[in-house]
Amino acid sequence: MGAQQGKDRGAHSGGGGSGAPVSCIGLSSSPVASVSPHCISSSSGVSSAPLGGGSTLRGSRIKSSSSGVASGSGSGGGGGGSGSGLSQRSGGHKDARCNPTVGLNIFTEHNEALLQSRPLPHIPAGSTAASLLADAAELQQHQQDSGGLGLQGSSLGGGHSSTTSVFESAHRWTSKENLLAPGPEEDDPQLFVALYDFQAGGENQLSLKKGEQVRILSYNKSGEWCEAHSDSGNVGWVPSNYVTPLNSLEKHSWYHGPISRNAAEYLLSSGINGSFLVRESESSPGQRSISLRYEGRVYHYRISEDPDGKVFVTQEAKFNTLAELVHHHSVPHEGHGLITPLLYPAPKQNKPTVFPLSPEPDEWEICRTDIMMKHKLGGGQYGEVYEAVWKRYGNTVAVKTLKEDTMALKDFLEEAAIMKEMKHPNLVQLIGVCTREPPFYIITEFMSHGNLLDFLRSAGRETLDAVALLYMATQIASGMSYLESRNYIHRDLAARNCLVGDNKLVKVADFGLARLMRDDTYTAHAGAKFPIKWTAPEGLAYNKFSTKSDVWAFGVLLWEIATYGMSPYPAIDLTDVYHKLDKGYRMERPPGCPPEVYDLMRQCWQWDATDRPTFKSIHHALEHMFQESSITEAVEKQLNANATSASSSAPSTSGVATGGGATTTTAASGCASSSSATASLSLTPQMVKKGLPGGQALTPNAHHNDPHQQQASTPMSETGSTSTKLSTFSSQGKGNVQMRRTTNKQGKQAPAPPKRTSLLSSSRDSTYREEDPANARCNFIDDLSTNGLARDINSLTQRYDSETDPAADPDTDATGDSLEQSLSQVIAAPVTNKMQHSLHSGGGGGGIGPRSSQQHSSFKRPTGTPVMGNRGLETRQSKRSQLHSQAPGPGPPSTQPHHGNNGVVTSAHPITVGALDVMNVKQVVNRYGTLPKGARIGAYLDSLEDSSEAAPALPATAPSLPPANGHATPPAARLNPKASPIPPQQMIRSNSSGGVTMQNNAAASLNKLQRHRTTTEGTMMTFSSFRAGGSSSSPKRSASGVASGVQPALANLEFPPPPLDLPPPPEEFEGGPPPPPPAPESAVQAIQQHLHAQLPNNGNISNGNGTNNNDSSHNDVSNIAPSVEEASSRFGVSLRKREPSTDSCSSLGSPPEDLKEKLITEIKAAGKDTAPASHLANGSGIAVVDPVSLLVTELAESMNLPKPPPQQQQKLTNGNSTGSGFKAQLKKVEPKKMSAPMPKAEPANTIIDFKAHLRRVDKEKEPATPAPAPATVAVANNANCNTTGTLNRKEDGSKKFSQAMQKTEIKIDVTNSNVEADAGAAGEGDLGKRRSTGSINSLKKLWEQQPPAPDYATSTILQQQPSVVNGGGTPNAQLSPKYGMKSGAINTVGTLPAKLGNKQPPAAPPPPPPNCTTSNSSTTSISTSSRDCTSRQQASSTIKTSHSTQLFTDDEEQSHTEGLGSGGQGSADMTQSLYEQKPQIQQKPAVPHKPTKLTIYATPIAKLTEPASSASSTQISRESILELVGLLEGSLKHPVNAIAGSQWLQLSDKLNILHNSCVIFAENGAMPPHSKFQFRELVTRVEAQSQHLRSAGSKNVQDNERLVAEVGQSLRQISNALNR
């Protein structure tokens, strides 16, 4: 759209330039017009070219108008560069469709306004204004060339006025406004011009129109009001800030005064091609610049002044005034010197709010600056379409920029009001509008696969079988039936106006626009885009439209679908269509089209409208067209057939989607399907979308029921969309970002959320690598004799990706990423990855779980109409699905264990036994360090596989992930790395970091949903939905356990499945310890899930590992924390955004908040004592927890190091046996249990760890009691994260409390826990963690240093706790560095992330955990950087690590803390916890930092950390910073064009870590004051650059090369400064 708009605008501006340099509307400005060579309008004939340059559409539309129109439009456009962009098009249109007279009239109206207020500050009023200008310009241009700009403008304006209301013209910007001849009065000091519309509120007030000129005679005492006399003779008071002197620059909509370059870039980030502003330099007053956006980047042009006072940008064109210069450059022409014409003035930020533009602010009105435009997706009749990010929620949305002349703003607003009420799963949901100033935006949900026409043409018969086509047609009929029931006429139904999401979900789009178009626009005129071949005969003959004419169009659409996107009436000229139809001709039956379908087409093509069927009957016919089976069933069959060949999951998905609830159930095939089905029922279309990939979800269920089905699903993934998904999933890391966009129809780019990835900087790289590994692994899994599992996983992966992708990007991202990574990382990588999906979805039954979760996603999707909302819903559903999944899991225990667990690993005995250590490690890694992208991790995993030591560490990391996933079970799995096969799966599950994914989704989705539709689920989809979705307490856990089906299997899985009767997840206050939500939508949810897992783990939570349960709860918490952090890092935006709204709080509701407060208070009270406990509860802090235990154990085994977590693990083991006892156990979750020694090899260590965790609190006194204390802390955190969870836990008593804490923890405890974990990680995993954040290189280093890890481990052992805390700090490290980091850091950080969730872990997520404690935001970043550095250092010297840890801890703990990195207090706390042996636990309670939860995202890590430990701050040593600098410099050596979006985020995170480390260093370092000042300047620059890097993925290569060069320069300067 931007380009198109640019063209149009260019044309407009060109027109304006030629015709109306003076008059923005084409009114006045003949001089300018003539001056501007590119004034398209200037020369009627020439104008075409300018127009062409600026407006292809306009040119075509205006063809009839011919040069005149073109020029008119051009001039209008030029005139209203910004405002007229739209109008210009209409000008073209109008000219084409309207006679010049109309244009003139419209223009005249506009002109009058212009003349009245010569300098229209914001002329961009309506799209029409631009068109007016265009038309007027056209006429004017000829005149204007002579110089009769004003006259022409007026005449044109007159013509155009009819079309364009003054209101519109007022909103339209045209450069001509700037050119309006000043006239004699310009110098009159009393003449003012209105900047905004003002609606008089009283008798004595005077209403103003923007651009209107008034004479100001006096002011009131306060100066807030002034007495204005209008030209019409009216007198009244107007607000003084609504008017500005006529001769001031402020009157111009494009003049922003003294704002900084950065502020200008920020303002323009929400613009499109041609958005611009003129600003004055802050540093050198009087020096002005033009800031212009083009193709995603902002260009700054200095405005020079020559000795004669003339201003110019290029020597060739000099002007007397700034307005003339702007006008000249707003008209497209050769050699104007700017990269693109100036089209849309950026909205001013300081608009007075006292008098809003409209009496009541529209809830649908979105602040333009909340929208960050990314790239153009295409252009259409109404304008261009962009992919954008809604920054408030981090959601990917589609933005349509409306061409101003296409429709009247008033009509558009009325229509938008109707669109806002249209909510149906098969209608694209309106999210909001930007109508304050042009360009006008319509913001809708994002559909990843674009329009149906292109989809049909690109897919072909191999991918889309008849069932899929019928399914899509049915969805369209469903959406149109809804419109019909609302008496709504679409008027432009065609394949090009339907959008495709994942799983073949189809939605009707543009249903609100056709009617909005001016009547004349929809009158066939030469060159107009009138859909003749889709229009019913009565529409062609009499321009009559009705729902029956939409039915005719549907018949043509059916034909398009049947022919895979052929153009209708082939070989028939447009002009002959009507005559042929009149003679009875109808298109023949397409080859391969079933007669029933063709009969339906022919019914739609009845000449008499009354003979045509209704959409309701059409929908019914399509649903029941074949063999008395519903279309859903038919589709399902077809898909299943395909599935066998292509991907069974796909068919089931389609079945689900199509069937609506019923079909879904069928597709679900089994318990999962039934629950899912219900959900999908309501959300049929959406579900379908997800469902198709959901087919895979179905497949998992099928797997439960039928291994063959499982296999079938695999094939599906292999072929067709599923296969794509599969591949995508495997390559998810790469495409994750896009996946999020829903671009991956097949789930290709599943949502590797760049943000989330950013947390683990190397995760992206990992992802890339992982892709191959993932594929290899998939094969491997099959090889592992886990064919079913592999397939399951594949389908799951695909399905999950696709599911999350559209509706729950975050979910998908997290899941996809972690899964992807998991796959790569885990030896049974393919299974693992897929397992992760499955784990993500159904804790126990990997395959099943994931699928069900995906079903949920699709499920959710339908619930949330808006895309954003959908995501939230999806997330919700995903959780539900998982729950369902759990239930179904039991049915096919054996199969489920296979896929359910990483079951592949388990199933594959060879893997189970032989690669147990590696698998466990991988699992842990997957779990703990859910690197967003599987690729990197995969690569690292491969490396890890080589070294069992590394492998063991990995498992530890994996555990943290499960919490993210909200799979208590996974945590158990990671706790039980012993059960090699299962642990990997579980790890995978964790790794899925469904929690993270969901989290982001939930956060973003929920918020969005809340905003657009109030959905209980929407508010906290994860919580209630999750709970509702699966009655089993812990859907994920359940899923795991269920998937296992048999408790023993669960044990194999590494975590006994929670009893199905487990109380609902903590999400519900009353529910027993609910299982962690399968994929908590928000970090909080993830945390909660983990907490639940932990609690249940403590009391044999649903983890499915009795033993694991205890530890698991802790681990889960940790995991969750990492998840949260991961989520935030992956979806940095989402988490942060959520932070403000407290993820769980919003989800849980106010009661949880109270609980939260209580918890916080309790935590504070228990602060030091309980901090460790809370850490434990978090499970992150408590390495003791299963994951840690697992990690430690595995690490110990691998590295022959003593592991502290055996105790917990043992417990977990017990838990395994007591899967059914979960509930009770949950309740039992007593600190004792937690502290109960895990009989495992290193029970003492575990205990110590536990104590250490407690200690972290400041008291190592409660080894047994800690569980409750942690619970409390966790609850407090939970309160932050999940109030509901907290309440629930409270009710459940210590068990619940503990659970809540776990969840909460994550935010609070996460801080401490994270710190602890970090310490542990620092000890052993720190290396990995830090590295993890660092970069691929750091990851490599980490890996390479993994062997040193043992040394670290020693240090860790000395902080065995830390090791445990890390959940296997070493494992974390061993994980891919990213993963490792995530594991440890994430564990640590993971917990922190809960808190951190708010913060933006992306920058340096792993470190944040330590940070978290100190100060969520700053510490985290520092922590990460420190960690990064330390980890690298650590390899070389454990002591160093200790020092790093020290950074975070008090002086006593400083040596250890240093390892932590830069987290101040949090770090210290963590470290202390880590060094459980160290009696001098930091005095700083981890809990206190909980409040920082929100701060987590805060950048000022340094400050936060400072308080935590200034002494330790100094710990951030010169060497560690230099090492980090070296790492970063290595990362920057890659060619810019080879760096993916996720890698940019990782770079940004690493840079942020460096920034935090430097801040701390500067604070505490021995530097002379002047050096310190310069150093801080440098560091501030680095911080800004890290922010720029975050958006580098959407920028062009030149920008990024420049940015990378700047970063490299900054890094060199930092190293120079440090070396001085």
From Swiss-Prot:
Residues 71-84, 147-160 have a biased composition (Gly residues). The active site is at D492. GO terms for molecular function: ATP binding; non-membrane spanning protein tyrosine kinase activity; protein tyrosine kinase activity. Residues 803-814 have a biased composition (Acidic residues). GO terms for biological process: axis elongation; axon guidance; axon midline choice point recognition; axonogenesis; branchiomotor neuron axon guidance; central nervous system development; chemical synaptic transmission; compound eye development. Arm and ena colocalize with Abl at adherens junctions throughout development. A motif (Kinase activation loop) lies at residues 510-534. Disruption phenotype: Both loss- and gain-of-function mutants exhibit neurons within the pCC/MP2 pathway that incorrectly project across the midline. Loss of Abl disrupts cell migration and cell shape changes during dorsal closure. RNAi-mediated knockdown in the neurons of adult males, significantly reduces survival to 53 percent. Adult survival begins to decrease from approximately day 14 post eclosion. Pan-neuronal or glutamatergic neuron-specific RNAi-mediated knockdown decreases adult climbing behavior. It catalyses: L-tyrosyl-[protein] + ATP = O-phospho-L-tyrosyl-[protein] + ADP + H(+). This is Tyrosine-protein kinase Abl. CDD domains: PTKc_Abl, SH2_ABL, SH3_Abl. ATP binds at residues 377-385, 400, 445-451. InterPro entries: ABL_SH2 (IPR035837), F-actin-binding (IPR015015), Kinase-like_dom_sf (IPR011009), Non-receptor_tyrosine_kinases (IPR050198), Prot_kinase_dom (IPR000719), Protein_kinase_ATP_BS (IPR017441), Ser-Thr/Tyr_kinase_cat_dom (IPR001245), SH2 (IPR000980). Residues 1-97, 139-168, 642-672, 687-774, 798-819, 836-906, 951-998, 1012-1154, 1199-1222, 1362-1470 are annotated as: Disordered. Belongs to the protein kinase superfamily. Tyr protein kinase family. ABL subfamily. Residues 1055-1080, 1402-1411 have a biased composition (Pro residues). Residues 708-747, 896-905, 987-998, 1433-1448 have a biased composition (Polar residues). Residues 33-50, 58-70, 642-656, 663-672, 756-765, 1023-1044, 1097-1119, 1412-1432 have a biased composition (Low complexity). The modification Phosphotyrosine is found at Y522, Y1497. Residues 1-11 have a biased composition (Basic and acidic residues). Residues 187-248 form the SH3 domain. Arm and Abl proteins function cooperatively at adherens junctions in both the CNS and epidermis; critical for embryonic epithelial morphogenesis regulating cell shape changes and cell migration. Plays a critical role in transducing embryonic midline repulsive cues; may regulate cytoskeletal dynamics underlying a growth cone's response to midline cues. The ability of pCC/MP2 axons to correctly interpret midline repulsive cues and stay on the ipsilateral side is dependent on the strength of both Slit/robo and Abl-dependent signaling pathways. Its EC number is 2.7.10.2. Gene3D superfamilies: Nucleotidyltransferases domain 2, Phosphorylase Kinase, domain 1, SH2 domain, SH3 Domains, Transferase(Phosphotransferase) domain 1. GO terms for cellular component: apical cortex; axon; cell cortex; cytosol; extrinsic component of cytoplasmic side of plasma membrane; plasma membrane; synapse. The gene is Abl. It comes from Drosophila melanogaster.
